[in-house]
Structure formats: structure tokens, C-alpha cells
């Protein structure tokens, strides 16, 4: 049947100047493939990150690992691949991250750690997630963390580059990095940023795991009052070599207070835009809670 309409037809609104009126997020270009290879990324890391960005969860895979052990890998593996998680479930029944999540906290503190008597205190910021972003302050605030620029604005920071020259060699480069860290803290640095953004410009990259371990050990040096320099500062790892949850947990276990995985952030934005980065943060938060749940918690 026919329906006769009366009255003027509603006209479509005129298009907005410069576009269709529908705001579409422009995704940045992916980082160069050579940069990914230099930091040890492979196809598995790419597929893993895609799952995080699209679903906000870690991918589900089969049990077991059928790849070569790190010591037998013909390619140069990152240091974290030589380490595996030790599961120590001592509760019966096993504690459940999904239903007993209130037992787990991913909070961390940036800044000086005061002594029990109050001496040596300074500015301290609590992060609900030990992941610092390069940009997007609103997204960082939504996850209870900070951007790198906010860290630099709120604290006295010192940036150290984990690299060595061919002439000096790895051991001498590590020794120099340790000395630079000690000097920076003695001069008042509240946050040490180990950044490999410029690591391949005129030098050879030092694996950030090795750099964190060396700096953390060097800062155990005590001052005139007998207090370790480590209490005066926090370690923030700004690295392109952070590829997955295991890398994040590995660096935190070595002594870092927070991690800024800049290459992972760039790749997530290139894949799914801002939504993809939010998915990565959510997945890493869940993953860290899962790691904590297997460390051995008992009443």
C-alpha cells in the first residue's frame, strides 16, 4: 500500500566544513620494522600485542613452549628470555585473581622513600598501575598513572641512556652507567629514567634488564648517614625492548618502580588507535595481578 506524506521533507544537515561530520581517529604510522628487530621483537610479539590491543586480554594459547631455549637460540634473545616465572601457589584452594582481585594491588610509588623516623622524605606520587605513558594525559589519568612529561614536571629527574661504545666495551659501559646513576642521585635526582630512545645513535644498546640490575645494585651505596642511595630515588624504565607482560614483570622484579614501554605504545596506537592503547593497559594490569596471584600468598 501507499502512504502519502504531507508537509515538507526533512532535509539532511549540510556537511561540516572539512569533512563528513563523523570524527575518525587518525592512527599514526607504525614504527620502522628495523627498530622492532633491533629491540628483539618477533612475529609472536606482534601477534601478542594485536590481541592485547583488540581484546584487552592476553591471548589464550596451548600449554608448553616449543621454541628454542634462550641459550640455544641462534638469534640474539633479550635478557628476559633467559628467565622464567616461578609459580608458588601455597593456598588451598588456589587464590583466584578473577574472584578475589581485592587481594592484589598493582600500585607503586615514585619519588623518595622516607625513613621510618621521617628523615629523607620528599615528593611521592602513587601510581595505581606501574605503566607510564609517553602521551595522552587523559588516558593515563583514567588508569591512575602519569605521562612521562608529568613525571619530569613533578620530580627532579635525570635521564640515562643504557648504551656503550665499541671502544669502551660492555663492562666499561655498565661501570660508567653505574657511576652516572650514583652521581645523579647524590645531586638530588628523585627519579632516574633509563631511556633507550637514543640508544642506537652513536652507541650499542645495553639490554635494559642488565642496566636496571646494575644501577639498582650501584645505588645500594650508603651515604654519610649510613642510608642507601636507593631510598632517595625511583627507577623508571623507558624502553622499546619491553614487548610483553613477562618483560614488564621482569623489570619490576629487578627493581624498577615503573615502566614506560614506548615502542609498545606506538605500535598499539598504530594498530587500534587510542582504544588499542587502553586495551594494552587493561591487559597488562590484569596480567600483573595474575603474576602476583602465583607468587605465594597465604594467611
State where each predicted segment sits.
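Phosphate/diphosphate-binding loops
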Residues: 1-2, 214-298
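Glycine-rich, proline-tolerant flexible connector loops at the mouths of alpha/beta enzymes
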Residues: 194-210
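Hydrophobic residues within beta-strands of alpha/beta enzymes
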Residues: 192-193, 259
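Glycine- and other small-residue-rich loops at beta-strand/loop junctions that grip anionic moieties
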Residues: 72, 197, 204, 237-241, ...
Amino acid at each position: 500500500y501507499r502512504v502519502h506524506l504531507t508537509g515538507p521533507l526533512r532535509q539532511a544537515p549540510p556537511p561540516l566544513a572539512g569533512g563528513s561530520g563523523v570524527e575518525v581517529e587518525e592512527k599514526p604510522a607504525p614504527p620502522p620494522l628495523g627498530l622492532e628487530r633491533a629491540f628483539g621483537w618477533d612475529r609472536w610479539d606482534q601477534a601478542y600485542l594485536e590481541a592485547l590491543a583488540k581484546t584487552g586480554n592476553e591471548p589464550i594459547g596451548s600449554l608448553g613452549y616449543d621454541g628454542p631455549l634462550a641459550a640455544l637460540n641462534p638469534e640474539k634473545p633479550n635478557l628476559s628470555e633467559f628467565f622464567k616465572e616461578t609459580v608458588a601457589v601455597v593456598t588451598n584452594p588456589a587464590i583466584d585473581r578473577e574472584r578475589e582481585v581485592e587481594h592484589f594491588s598493582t600500585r607503586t610509588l615514585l619519588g623518595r622513600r622516607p625513613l621510618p623516623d621521617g628523615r629523607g622524605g620528599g615528593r611521592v606520587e602513587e601510581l595505581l598501575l606501574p605503566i607510564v605513558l609517553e602521551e595522552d594525559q587523559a588516558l593515563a589519568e583514567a588508569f591512575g598513572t602519569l605521562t612521562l612529561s608529568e613525571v619530569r614536571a613533578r620530580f627532579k629527574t635525570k635521564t640515562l641512556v643504557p648504551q656503550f661504545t665499541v671502544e669502551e666495551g660492555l663492562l666499561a659501559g655498565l661501570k660508567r652507567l653505574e657511576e652516572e646513576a650514583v652521581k645523579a642521585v647524590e645531586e638530588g635526582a628523585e627519579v632516574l629514567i633509563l631511556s633507550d630512545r637514543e640508544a642506537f645513535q652513536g652507541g650499542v644498546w645495553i639490554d635494559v634488564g642488565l642496566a636496571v640490575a646494575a644501577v639498582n645494585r650501584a645505588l645500594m651505596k650508603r651515604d654519610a648517614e649510613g642510608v642507601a642511595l636507593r631510598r632517595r630515588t625511583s627507577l623508571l624504565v623507558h624502553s622499546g625492548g619491553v614487548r610483553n607482560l613477562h618483560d614488564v614483570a621482569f623489570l619490576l622484579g629487578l627493581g624498577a618502580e615503573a615502566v614506560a614501554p614506548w615502542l609498545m605504545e606506538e605500535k598499539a596506537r598504530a594498530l587500534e588507535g587510542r582504544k588499542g592503547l587502553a586495551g594494552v593497559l587493561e591487559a597488562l594490569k590484569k596480567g600483573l595481578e595474575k603474576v602476583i596471584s602465583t607468587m605465594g600468598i597465604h594467611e
